[in-house]
Design a protein with these regions (language model features):
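Short, hydrophobic-biased amphipathic alpha-helical segments
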Residues: 249, 257-268
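Active-site acidic/histidine proton-transfer and metal-coordination neighborhood
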Residues: 73-77, 89-181, 189, 258-259, ...
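Gly/Pro-rich active-site loop or hairpin
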Residues: 14, 18-32, 126-129, 166, ...
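Glycine-enriched alpha-helix->loop->beta-strand junction motifs that scaffold or abut catalytic
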Residues: 46, 173-180, 201-206
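Active-site beta-loop-alpha junctions enriched in small/polar residues
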Residues: 9-11, 53-55, 83-88, 120-122, ...
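N-terminal pre-domain/capping segments
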Residues: 1-109, 140, 151, 265-279
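Hydrophobic faces of well-ordered beta-strands that scaffold small-molecule active sites
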Residues: 2-8, 50-52, 78-83, 115-117, ...
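Short, hinge-like loop/turn segments at secondary-structure boundaries
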Residues: 24, 68-70, 96-99, 133-134, ...
Length: 279
C-alpha cells in the first residue's frame, strides 16, 4: 500500500555542518530552522510520513525518543533519513564510514524505514572510470551496514553528483548492488527519462522521490505544476511492483511551502496507484 511522506527540506533548504570543511567524519546535511514547525506543517498538509536529513537528528542524539514522540504525536512516521558522502577517495573512506555508522545508528534509533544516500564527489578534472568502481564498493559496504541496522538503503542520483546523467547512473549501478531511490525530477533534469530508468532498474527500485520539473528552467515544482508525465512515471513505479512510501521533495522552491505541500498531496490523491492488470 502506498503511503505519502514529505521531505523536511522544503522548509529551509539544506546546509552542511561546518566541521566538514576540515573533517570528513563530521559532515552532515542539515535543514536550518525549527524542525518541530516542519513536523507540524507536514502533518497539517495531510501527509502521514516525514523524511529528513541525518544532521537534523544530531541535536536529539542523546534524546531520540523525545524526537520520535514529537513525530508520532503529529500522526507521522519517519519514512526515511537522507545522507550523502564523497565515496571516491579511498584514503578518506575510514573517516567517511565512521560518519555513516553514526548516521545509520541515528536513523535506526529514530525508527526510519528508508536510508537514502546521495552524492559521490565529482573531481575538478571530471568523473573517472575508477571512481565508479570505488564508489560502488563503498556503497555496498554502507548498504550492508544499513541493512544490518534494519534500514532499507538506496542510492539517489542527483544533479552535480557522480551519477547525474543516464550513463553516469548506469556506470555506478554496474559497480554496486544497492537499491535505487528514483528521484524523478533529478533524473529528468540530468537528461534522463524517469520512466526508462525506473523500468531498467525495476528489480532494484527501493524508494521513490517525486517532484515536478520545468524543463526549460530546471526549476523543481509541486506535483502537477511542471511538465513531467507524472501519471506515466507513477504507472511505471506500480508496474515495478513498488508499494511503499512515496516521498514528495521540493527543494529550492520559491513559492509558499505549505501550499506546495498541499497541492502535491491533492495531486497524489487523484492518481490511481493500482495496476489494472493485477488481480
Amino acid at each position: 500500500m502506498m503511503k505519502f511522506a514529505y521531505e523536511a527540506n522544503a522548509w529551509g533548504g539544506v546546509v552542511g555542518t561546518p566541521g566538514a570543511v576540515t573533517d570528513l567524519g563530521s559532515g552532515f546535511y542539515v535543514t536550518p530552522g525549527d524542525v518541530h514547525h516542519t513536523i507540524e506543517a507536514i502533518a497539517a498538509a495531510g501527509y502521514t510520513g516525514i523524511e529528513l536529513f541525518d544532521g537534523n537528528l544530531l541535536p536529539f542524539e542523546e534524546s531520540i525518543d523525545s524526537f520520535v514522540s514529537a513525530v508520532q504525536a503529529n500522526g507521522l512516521e519517519i519514512a526515511g533519513v537522507y545522507t550523502g558522502g564523497h565515496f571516491i577517495y579511498s584514503d578518506a573512506q575510514e573517516d567517511e564510514l565512521a560518519r555513516f555508522d553514526r548516521s545509520i545508528r541515528l536513523a535506526a534509533l529514530a525508527g526510519a524505514r528508508h536510508y537514502v544516500i546521495g552524492g559521490g564527489a565529482v573531481r575538478s578534472t571530471g568523473r573517472r572510470a575508477q571512481d565508479y568502481e570505488t564508489a560502488g564498493a563503498f556503497l555496498d559496504t554502507v548498504a550492508e551496514r544499513a541493512q544490518a541496522a534494519g534500514l532499507i538503503p538506496s542510492y539517489h542520483p542527483h544533479l552535480g553528483s557522480i551519477a547525474q546523467a543516464p550513463d553516469h547512473i548506469d556506470a555506478l549501478f554496474a559497480a554496486t548492488s544497492i537499491g535505487l531511490c528514483a528521484d524523478v525530477a533529478h533524473i529528468a533534469a540530468g537528461g534522463g527519462d524517469p520512466v526508462a530508468v525506473i523500468r531498467k532498474y525495476a528489480d532494484r527500485l527501493a524508494y521513490v522521490h517525486l517532484k515536478d520539473l520545468d524543463h526549460e528552467t530546471n526549476a523543481f515544482l509541486p506535483l502537477g505544476a511542471g511538465d513531467l508525465d507524472l501519471n506515466a512515471i507513477i504507472a511505471e513505479v506500480v508496474d515495478a511492483g513498488y508499494h511503499d512510501w512515496i516521498t514528495v521533495e521540493l527543494d529550492g522552491y520559491e513559492g509558499d511551502e505549505d501550499d506546495a505541500a498541499k497541492r502535491s498531496l491533492t495531486f497524489l490523491q487523484n492518481v490511481t496507484f493500482t495496476d489494472p492488470a493485477r488481480p
